Amino acid sequence: EKKPLIYKQNKKALNLNLYKNTKNTLKRDWSASIHDIGDGVLNVEFHSIFVPAVNPLDRSMNDIMKHALDLLETGKYKGLVVGHQGKNWCAGANVNDFKMAIDSGNLQVMDAGVKEMQEVTQRIRHSKYPVVTCPFNLALGGGFEFYACSSHTVASGELYAGLVEAIQGLIPDDQQ
């Protein structure tokens, strides 16, 4: 006779998958979503539909982060948790986006994307509300920058993080 498996929720852990429904989802885009997880706290979840295994940073993710920070600054919310329960946190920028901009000669698009990312990280860094990031597994390049600028980080014991742009032949911009 099969018996049901009884699952005990750790009282100190938050299962973010429980908040992924239409009632709690405030905005959803290609690579990220904003959820209201109660008690005046927002959650930004990364979930790239293009490369879900690594959640590469793209315009959609930046737009969601900007919108979440806008909501936070209204005063209706008192904190933001950036975390999800996928395979990897964020393995950095989608280098193919940069390659396409360079190949097409449209460097303004690339410059605008870099500037937008810098503006988002500065808003996270200087937010008067707490922004808690929860990186795990891969947090490379822009993924590292997202959590390095937050007011609080709750990192997984299994975290591989850093600025790996030099491996790609690029020089990271640390002029923050």
Stretches found by the model and what they are:
Residues 46-50, 102, 165:
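Short, histidine-centered active-site or binding-site loop motifs used for metal coordination
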